[in-house]
Regions:
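Extracellular structured ligand-interaction cores
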Residues: 146, 155-157, 175-177
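A glycine-anchored, Pro-Gly-centered beta-turn/N-cap motif
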Residues: 151-160, 164
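Charge-rich, acidic-biased intrinsically disordered regions
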Residues: 142, 165-167
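Nucleic-acid endonuclease domains
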Residues: 118-122, 132-135, 140-141
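Primarily secretory-pathway and cell-envelope proteins
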Residues: 1-107, 111-113, 124, 128-131, ...
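Beta-strand residues in well-ordered beta-sheet regions across diverse protein folds
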Residues: 114-115, 159
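Beta-sandwich interaction modules
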Residues: 139-150
Length: 208
């Protein structure tokens, strides 16, 4: 797949951003906010996901302070990603399957929506100065594991909606997607943990 997958104008056509989730999850974060938090917590390892898993209090603090938001577990497939703040939405060919509100995120200059595998061995240089993170498969197909969005600095309450295409299309078309919405707030009031499986089910590909 070429860069036409990225949300850029070609004439009057706006192409979709399609995210490959080889690691069964999506995360939202802002590079500078994340780096400041890791420095404050004296975290030097690049294995950020494992560090959060091994340090539950640090993980909860990261959610409370809007450092990142992990959305797990979802099928390891490609999803169409849209941000309502960029005037993006799913049309009537899609059916909304769920909506969850009130997750914290702090943004400085830009927001990344990426495959959670980015946090296995985090390399900030993959993101700095780039609009997307991509890689090529052995058969020459380009897949995208992260997209950058221009979002004003500040604190936000995040909502996530899951969508399914009403009439499934054949591969390589994506039949599932997520719509994110950011509402600016002055301060965070509490926080929600998206890993509370009894409360949340983000696996839109498995929702009937």
């Amino acid at each position: 797949m070429e860069k036409s997958l990225v949300n850029r104008k070609k004439g009057d056509v706006i192409m979709d951003r399609i995210l490959d989730t080889g690691s069964y999850g999506i995360c939202l974060f802002s590079i500078e906010v994340l780096q400041d938090f890791l420095k404050k917590e004296k975290v030097r390892t690049k294995k950020i996901l494992k560090n959060f898993q091994d340090n539950h209090n640090r993980y909860l603090a990261s959610l409370e302070n809007g450092i990142w938001i992990p959305f797990l577990s979802i099928n390891s497939i490609e999803y169409i990603i849209k941000l309502e703040n960029c005037n993006e939405s799913f049309d009537d060919e899609w059916e909304e399957k769920f909506v969850y509100h009130d997750f914290n995120i702090e943004v400085k200059d830009s927001l990344w929506i990426a495959d959670i595998g980015s946090f296995y061995e985090f390399d900030k240089n993959e993101f700095l100065g780039n609009e997307e993170v991509s890689y090529e498969t052995l058969d020459g197909k380009t897949l995208y594991s992260g997209f950058r969005y221009s979002v004003s600095s500040g604190k936000y309450s995040v909502s996530i909606k899951g969508y399914v295409r009403k009439n499934k299309l054949d591969y390589p078309n994506s039949n599932f997607g997520f719509l994110f919405s950011l509402k600016k707030v002055n301060e965070f009031k509490g926080f929600n943990d998206p890993r509370e499986d009894e409360r949340y089910n983000f696996n839109v590909a498995k929702i009937v």
